[in-house]
Amino acid sequence: MPVLKKRKLAHTAQPDPIVSDLESSSSEASQQSHDEQLTAANEQDDESPQVQREEAVTKSFKDLGIIDSLCEACEALGYKSPTPIQAESIPLALQGRDLIGLAETGSGKTAAFALPILQALMNKPQSLFGLILAPTRELACQISEAFEALGSLISVRCAVIVGGMDMVSQAISLGKKPHIIVATPGRLLDHLENTKGFSLRSLKYLVMDEADRLLDLDFGPILDKILKVLPRERRTYLFSATMSSKVESLQRASLSNPLRVSISSNKYQTVATLLQSYLFIPHKYKDIYLVYLLNEYAGQSAIVFTRTVNETQRLAILLRALGFGSIPLHGQLSQSSRLGALSKFRSRSRDILVATDVAARGLDIPSVDVVLNFDLPSDSKTYIHRVGRTARAGKSGHAFSIVTQYDIEVWLRIENALGKKLDEYKVEKEEVMVLSDRVGEAQRHAITEMKDLHEKRGSRGATLKGRRPAKGAKRGRDEMDREEG
């Protein structure tokens, strides 16, 4: 690909609207925690390329160099103006540079890499043009949908290659020579090794999205094998929420003289439009207080986070018995059931999603009014990801955490990481306990239904579907893109 003349980047620093847990790389970065910071990523060279800034504000995708037809697609999808990660990375991508983008889920990073790839595809159409690697099946499906929507005017063809689906039908899709492949690493490697005639020797673009999660899910060795069969002459984009040592090793192995775009804030910073509070209650009353809160916010969309699969299923049953439109989401559901749950929640045919941390990160759920931590997460980073499902894109939102006598130490660690004491949500106990009888009846119903579910599935209560690998054992390649939670 010819090297294009470097354009000057027009952008002014503005607060990052997304909850972020990115590490500051220096004390100066900490002092400018809400500024977008653009740095060179070639750590082995002290003279890494830097991008000069200008004072003018980028107001449109056209200003970034995006062609009219793609600008029209952005407008049709409601993309009014570029997000910070888009404003920073798109001009550099159009110059033909490899990129590292540090930004959170919900920051608009999918369009940040999709638009340059689609624009290059329109200039030189070919099959098997781009490969996007994602850590989970749901995220792969969402990325494919974004490419098809943005590339609708040129009828871009995408193939989603993920675990849990039929290999033969996927091989047929690959045989039709799609423009873009969106895949999870394990299943892609299966096809590279076993599908006759399938090769990526002509690939022009590689994207590794949520690279930190790819490595957290132990995809590292598989990524190494995939990289060995890809052409060296390609453009590579790596997007990650954090820049860990593993991610740094991956970027050194896969990118050529990249530039780093960092839309960063304090490690545990939350947005100003997010109202966070907690309820300190006895453990035995958790169900009753949860129902009280959901009644207080009746008609609004909510995600209720739990720690285990069984608790997710139990609460979904309990809430349905009380007349709430609830649906569970966890890693033991089949792929079609998980996609169905997300679809119902997005369309608001169900307004309460009861979920494990499957839903904390990486899923395209555009508007959530309330987040309720029924079970506290075990670490502050997960808390940030959970509450980041609300108060997105400048909207306001509420996050409630139920804290019991067993959670005090964990809660204090979360507050310490946030750097502030959160407000207690005061309620009259008498008002809450009015619900005691109704909730008790629903609890008994949930216990009975859970027992029936376990008996039907031949389970003894450990999980609802299948069994987890023994401690220390590794999941098979086909199951690695399936969330555990």
Curated annotation (Swiss-Prot):
EC number: 3.6.4.13
Binding residues for ATP: 103-110
Keywords assigned: ATP-binding, Helicase, Hydrolase, Nucleotide-binding, Nucleus, Ribosome biogenesis, RNA-binding, rRNA processing
Major subcellular location class: nucleus
Subcellular location: Nucleus
GO molecular function annotations of the record: ATP binding; ATP hydrolysis activity; RNA binding; RNA helicase activity
Protein's UniProt keywords contain ATP-binding: yes
GO BP term (any one): rRNA processing
Catalysed conversion reaction: ATP + H2O = ADP + phosphate + H(+)
Biased composition (Basic residues): 1-10, 465-474
Residue ranges of the region described as Disordered: 1-55, 449-485
Biased composition (Basic and acidic residues): 449-458, 475-485
Matching InterPro entries: DDX47/Rrp3_DEADc, DEAD/DEAH_box_helicase_dom, DEAD_box_RNA_helicase, Helicase_ATP-bd, Helicase_C-like, P-loop_NTPase, RNA-helicase_DEAD-box_CS, RNA_helicase_DEAD_Q_motif
Sequence ranges assigned to domain Helicase ATP-binding in this UniProt record: 90-261
PANTHER family per the UniProt record, alphabetical: ATP-DEPENDENT RNA HELICASE RHLE-RELATED, RNA HELICASE
Function: ATP-dependent rRNA helicase required for pre-ribosomal RNA processing. Involved in the maturation of the 35S-pre-rRNA and to its cleavage to mature 18S rRNA.
Entry's free-text remark on domains: The Q motif is unique to and characteristic of the DEAD box family of RNA helicases and controls ATP binding and hydrolysis.
Name listed for the protein in its UniProt record: ATP-dependent rRNA helicase RRP3
Organism, scientific name: Ajellomyces capsulatus (strain NAm1 / WU24) (Darling's disease fungus)
